[in-house]
Curated annotation (Swiss-Prot):
Compositional bias annotation for Pro residues: 51-61
Pfam families, per database record: Lipoprotein_21
Keywords of the record: Cell membrane, Lipoprotein, Membrane, Palmitate, Signal
Origin: domain of life: Bacteria
Protein name (Swiss-Prot/TrEMBL): Putative lipoprotein LprE
Protein source organism: Mycobacterium tuberculosis (strain ATCC 25618 / H37Rv)
Lipidation (N-palmitoyl cysteine): C29
Length: 202
């Protein structure tokens, strides 16, 4: 009412009530029984980070993308014997056919010591036929390259005696009629192949 004086509202009791409620709330939420205290804190999410702009360069392969390989990454030694060399298959495919069977030659060597570093190396091949006794021959190489001319007749050889071979000498073998292995040695003389020895083994 106008003109009637009334005392102001007491604020102290309200502040006291509010303070008591806050204190009761805080006491009820002590660290010992709080669900907040028992809940692990959230870790920062990757989704809040800003994505990187797309790159035009391909990303490097992951280290865990492929299982480790048991194969070594070292390059193949060109001076090692390599009977699976593509050079052998190419040369054999270009040879004239076997004169007896008129068949091409099988590119898989029966024996040999072919390598790109030897002054003289050879492979023994057979005619690509199902005959019981196919024709065999040796094919010779100088520093990994086929020697097409100037080579003595190499038909009939069936193997190679690597224990008698050197960097410039090849020891080819063939079986004689009486069951003995014979060895014929050929050597690179600087300009061609020459026959240097003939021995009969047991």
């Amino acid at each position: 009412m106008p003109g009637v004086w009334s005392p102001p509202c007491p604020t102290t009791p309200r502040v006291g009530v509010v303070a008591a409620l806050v204190a009761a709330t805080l006491t009820g939420c002590g660290s010992g029984d709080s669900t907040v205290a028992k809940t692990p804190e959230a870790t920062p999410s990757l989704s809040t980070a800003h994505p990187a702009p797309p790159s035009s360069e391909p990303s490097p392969p992951s280290a865990t993308a492929a299982p480790p390989s048991n194969h070594s990454a070292a390059p193949v030694d060109p001076c090692a014997v390599n009977l699976a060399s593509p050079t052998i298959a190419k040369v054999v495919s270009e040879l004239p056919r076997d004169p007896r069977s008129e068949q091409p030659w099988n590119p898989e060597p029966l024996a040999g010591n072919y390598n790109e570093c030897a002054q003289l190396s050879a492979v023994v091949i057979k005619a690509n036929t199902n005959a019981g006794n196919p024709t065999t021959r040796a094919v010779m190489f100088h520093l990994g390259k086929y020697i097409p001319q100037g080579v003595p007749d190499t038909y009939g050889f069936t193997g190679i005696d690597t224990s008698q071979c050197t960097g410039d000498t090849v020891a080819l073998t063939y079986a004689s009629g009486i069951g003995l292995n014979n060895v014929v040695k050929f050597r690179w003389n600087g300009g061609g192949v020459e026959l240097i020895g003939n021995t009969t083994g047991g």
